[in-house]
């Protein structure tokens, strides 16, 4: 399954384009722009599993840094600052990684 099976390619392209400048990434705006906020809980979980590149059941910091590439291969990596901000927002239990429920909460709070 690819991201475009779940989300509009046009919405993804617009959202990626909105955050091309370094340190401009805003996960709340991004999740809204790609249409993730409007998706069912099942679809949000499917997106999580696409972003969980190593299939560990968690999105770790290195995967988080390349989260935009999970939506579009030609997107940029997040800066260290953006990655840490996103991890702080999503890692509710403080274990240094984001689980599927934490990701679902992160999207719901967008």
Swiss-Prot record:
UniProt lineage: Eukaryota, Metazoa, Chordata, Craniata, Vertebrata
Gene Ontology cellular-component annotations: axon; cuticular plate; cytoplasm; neuronal cell body; protein-containing complex; stereocilium; terminal bouton
Positions carrying N-acetylserine: 2
UniProt: Ca(2+) 1 binding residues: 52, 54, 56, 58, 60, 63
Organism: Rattus norvegicus (Rat)
Any one GO BP annotation for this protein: excitatory chemical synaptic transmission
Listed Pfam families: EF-hand_7
This protein's record includes keyword Coiled coil: no
SUPFAM superfamilies: EF-hand
Superkingdom to which the source organism belongs: Eukaryota
Domains as described in the record: AB domain, comprising of helices A and B, is involved in structural stabilization, protecting the hydrophobic core of the protein. It is required for high-affinity binding of Ca(2+) and for Mg(2+)-binding.
Record's function text: In muscle, parvalbumin is thought to be involved in relaxation after contraction. It binds two calcium ions.
Protein name per UniProt: Parvalbumin alpha
EF-hand domain sequence ranges: 39-74, 78-110
Keyword set, alphabetical order: Acetylation, Calcium, Metal-binding, Muscle protein, Phosphoprotein, Repeat
Binding residues for Ca(2+) 2: 91, 93, 95, 97, 102
């Amino acid at each position: 399954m690819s991201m475009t099976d779940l989300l509009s390619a046009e919405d993804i392209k617009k959202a990626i384009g909105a955050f091309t400048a370094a340190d401009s990434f805003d996960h709340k705006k991004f999740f809204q722009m790609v249409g993730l906020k409007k998706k069912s809980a099942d679809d949000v979980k499917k997106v999580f599993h696409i972003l969980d590149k190593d299939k560990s059941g968690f999105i770790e910091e290195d995967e988080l840094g390349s989260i935009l590439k999970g939506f579009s291969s030609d997107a940029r990596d997040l800066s260290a600052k953006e990655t840490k901000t996103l991890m702080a927002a999503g890692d509710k239990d403080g274990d240094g990684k984001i689980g599927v429920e934490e990701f679902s909460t992160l999207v719901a709070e967008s």
